[in-house]
């Protein structure tokens, strides 16, 4: 039981750093910040549900993707580690998001799915990570982690106003940099493990 809790906490911490829902708050608030609480609730709920569905689907079909493309887990770990390292370095530089939204051309439902849920929160890095987790850890713990990330995403986005007020834009940037540091260390370990596995070291 204690080992399962420890594994869950490790996976959750890693996924929280990768998805970085706090970094998505400024984008979320720029779209719905002026709207009633009911609409914020609906958009935040759609984002969290989309994040959960996206990550769960890729977690469940990840092994089939490996087999279909003839790729090994070690090769995927190296490629995924490089991708995560790049993301981590961007976060360390203070970049919150490169996603731009033209509010006149999209509905709130569309924004909830793209770009907020995909790729801002459940992007390539998060998808790669859950696929790798699924091959290394208990599937039940991985799915539980995804559920926890979905709920966390909802809570953070819905509390966007309070987070911005308490942290400020500087605080959000500092948090993003901290998540970036965690992410780069995870990425390096992923690359090292992939190289060890590929070359039998």
Swiss-Prot record:
Q: Where in the cell is it found?
A: Cell membrane
Q: Which UniProt keywords apply?
A: Cell membrane, Membrane, Transmembrane, Transmembrane helix
Keyword Magnesium in record: no
List cellular component terms (GO).
plasma membrane
Tree of life domain: Archaea
In which broad location class does this protein mainly occur, judging by the first location in its UniProt entry?
A: membrane
User: What is the topology of this protein in the membrane according to its UniProt annotation?
Assistant: Multi-pass membrane protein
Among PANTHER family, the record links this protein to: UPF0056 MEMBRANE PROTEIN YHCE
* Name of the protein in its database record: UPF0056 membrane protein PH0760
